[in-house]
Amino acid sequence: MARSLCFMAFAVLAMMLFVAYEVQAKSTCKAESNTFPGLCITKPPCRKACLSEKFTDGKCSKILRRCICYKPCVFDGKMIQTGAENLAEEAETLAAALLEEEMMDN
């Protein structure tokens, strides 16, 4: 009986630590590639462009077929500036990103 009690205490402690580390995990920042030319069809060329821009990964967006680069955020909850020239372009990019995230969640 004492063994099962110790095992249960260990299991609960392990689960609490696992959950605590998951909550503190860094979020991922993303930005459109500045060097990738044209439409993004396959991942390898996009990833190569993103690695050359000092990102850790790159993937093609599903709707707009743009190369999106990813890396761990330095500041939690803050997105990397995409270099948009005007407010209308930023709003369009944000709307497309939100739509894409919503579609990926479903």
Curated annotation (Swiss-Prot):
Record has Secreted as a keyword: yes
GO biological process: defense response to fungus; killing of cells of another organism
Subcellular location: Secreted; Vacuole
Primary location group: secreted
Family matches, as Gene3D superfamilies: Knottin, scorpion toxin-like
Disulfide bonds: C29-C73, C40-C60, C46-C67, C50-C69
InterPro entries the UniProt entry points to: Defensin_plant, Scorpion_toxin-like, Scorpion_toxin-like_sf
Leader sequence segment: 1-25
Listed Pfam families: Gamma-thionin (PF00304)
Induction text: By salt stress.
Protein family (similarity comment): Belongs to the DEFL family.
The protein, known as: Defensin-like protein 1
Gene this protein is translated from: THIO1
